[in-house]
Amino acid sequence: IVMVNVQQTLERWYAGGLLNNEALTHLRQQGEADGAKARALVDAAGLTYEFDVLFGQPGEVIARVAKEQSCIGIVMGARGLSDLDHLFLGSTAHKVIQLAEAPVTLVK
C-alpha cells in the first residue's frame, strides 16, 4: 500500500520565493495531519504501507506515483467541490482518472 498526501503548490510560488522552508514545513505538517486518520485505519488492520507528503499538482503527482510504484489500483476520496469551485479549481479525481494507467476507485 502506497499512501500519499499531496499539498498543492504552484510553480510560480517557487519562482517568486513564496515557498520558503517555513512554508514547506507547515505544508508537510498539514499533510501529515491530513493523513493521520487513514494511517490509523491501515495500522489497525495490521497492514504495511508507505506514506509520504508530496508537493505539486495533486492529480499529476498521484498518477505519477502510481506509475512509478507499479500500483495495480488507486483508491482516493472524492472531496465533492461545489459547481463553482469545480469550475475554477478542477477536480483532482477527474485529473487522476485522465492520467492514471491503473483503475481508479473513488470513495465518498
Positions of predicted regions on the chain:
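Short, well-ordered secondary-structure micro-motifs
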Residues: 13-16, 63-64, 86-87
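Structural beta-alpha unit
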Residues: 40-74
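Short beta->alpha linker loops
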Residues: 30, 53-57, 79
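Small/aliphatic-rich secondary-structure junction motif
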Residues: 1-17, 41-50
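Intrinsically disordered or low-complexity boundary/linker segments at protein termini
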Residues: 11-15, 73, 98-108
